């Protein structure tokens, strides 16, 4: 019998998740299907309940439903609790739903695979929304020496720094307080997609700075264009994070680790990168 999985979102037609998980299943010889479900904005809970009632084994959740998914769970991982959002649902043997958040693990895995080890690094996280919140604990657990957060609205950055203060060395800084020459800079803000980058000082970058944009597309992102012009030594977009978080979800469902590297190359080829 084929096990059913799906990704829920609105919109969802652009999702790469069905392709990614279908390739993971082929690699690991798993008997499973994976589809994309367009959930009504006002009917997400009903869509999820119907899916699991009809035999669904697990699901991914994307915008705008990650916070709603959080509230539907009977059990939550520590990552999901701190993120305040769920992107992975697992149906347990007793029928209860466990929620997890694999976004941050996907980010860390991709940075360490493609850029540099995060251990003992000074890291700047740009943005203080849901994408940032979901990644802070994995970044701290990766052993960063210092994690600074900056955001247009400073209060949001302060709230995140306070929430995660017991997990590591984390500070909220205004744009004028930022240090010089960070080891790694991560952009979690989606503002660049609309052509409105946060006005960051170029002094935060030197010739040894690695930059990572959680966004991705067929062209170099605006943030990475800016970072390269400011002298960053290397930049990456978030396509690998997408594949990395999917690999973590796949492991939670099937207890097997897929090869993310080959699937990421297939995606890059499809995007003409």
Curated annotation (Swiss-Prot):
Protein name according to UniProt: Shikimate dehydrogenase (NADP(+))
Binding locations of NADP(+): 78, 127-131, 151-156, 214, 238
Alphabetical list of Pfam families matching this protein: SDH_C, Shikimate_DH, Shikimate_dh_N
Residues noted as binding shikimate in the record, renumbered to the chain: 15-17, 62, 87, 103, 216
Alphabetical list of InterPro entries matching this protein: Aminoacid_DH-like_N_sf, NAD(P)-bd_dom_sf, SDH_C, Shikimate_DH, Shikimate_DH-bd_N, Shikimate_DH_fam, Shikm_DH/Glu-tRNA_Rdtase
SUPFAM superfamilies recorded: Aminoacid dehydrogenase-like, N-terminal domain (SSF53223), NAD(P)-binding Rossmann-fold domains (SSF51735)
EC identifiers of the protein: 1.1.1.25
Family assignment from sequence similarity: Belongs to the shikimate dehydrogenase family.
Task of the protein: Involved in the biosynthesis of the chorismate, which leads to the biosynthesis of aromatic amino acids. Catalyzes the reversible NADPH linked reduction of 3-dehydroshikimate (DHSA) to yield shikimate (SA).
GO MF, one annotated term: NADP binding
Pathway where this protein functions: Metabolic intermediate biosynthesis; chorismate biosynthesis; chorismate from D-erythrose 4-phosphate and phosphoenolpyruvate: step 4/7
Record Gene3D superfamilies: Leucine Dehydrogenase, chain A, domain 1, NAD(P)-binding Rossmann-like Domain
List of catalytic residues: 66
Catalytic activity: shikimate + NADP(+) = 3-dehydroshikimate + NADPH + H(+)
CDD domains the UniProt entry points to: NAD_bind_Shikimate_DH
GO biological process, alphabetically ordered: amino acid biosynthetic process; aromatic amino acid family biosynthetic process; chorismate biosynthetic process; shikimate metabolic process
Record's keyword terms, sorted: Amino-acid biosynthesis, Aromatic amino acid biosynthesis, NADP, Oxidoreductase
GO cellular component: cytosol
Subunit structure: Homodimer.
Gene for this chain: aroE
Provenance organism: Shewanella denitrificans (strain OS217 / ATCC BAA-1090 / DSM 15013)
């Amino acid at each position: 019998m084929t096990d059913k999985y799906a990704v829920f979102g609105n919109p969802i037609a652009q999702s790469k998740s069905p392709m990614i998980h279908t390739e993971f299943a082929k690699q690991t010889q798993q008997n499973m299907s994976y589809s994309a479900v367009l959930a009504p904005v006002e009917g997400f809970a009903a869509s999820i309940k119907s899916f699991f009632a009809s035999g669904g084994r697990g699901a991914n959740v994307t915008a705008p439903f990650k916070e709603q998914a959080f509230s539907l769970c009977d059990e939550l991982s520590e990552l999901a609790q701190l993120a305040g959002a769920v992107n992975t649902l697992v149906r347990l043997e007793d029928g209860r739903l466990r929620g997890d958040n694999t976004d941050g693990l996907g980010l860390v895995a991709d940075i360490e695979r493609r850029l540099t080890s995060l251990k003992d690094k000074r890291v700047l996280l740009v943005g203080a929304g849901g994408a940032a919140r979901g990644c802070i604990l994995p970044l701290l657990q990766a052993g960063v020496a210092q994690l600074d957060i900056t955001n247009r609205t400073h209060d949001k950055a302060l709230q995140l720094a306070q929430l995660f203060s017991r997990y590591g060395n984390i500070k909220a800084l205004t744009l004028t307080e930022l240090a010089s020459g960070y080891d790694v800079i991560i952009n979690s803000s989606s503002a660049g997609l609309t052509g409105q980058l946060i006005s960051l000082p170029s002094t935060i970058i030197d010739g040894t700075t690695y930059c990572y944009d959680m966004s991705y597309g067929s062209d170099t992102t605006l943030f990475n264009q800016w970072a390269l012009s400011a002298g960053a030594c290397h930049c990456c977009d978030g396509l690998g994070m997408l594949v990395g978080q999917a690999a973590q979800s796949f492991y939670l469902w099937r207890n097997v680790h897929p090869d993310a590297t080959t699937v990421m190359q297939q995606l890059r080829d499809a995007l003409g990168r």
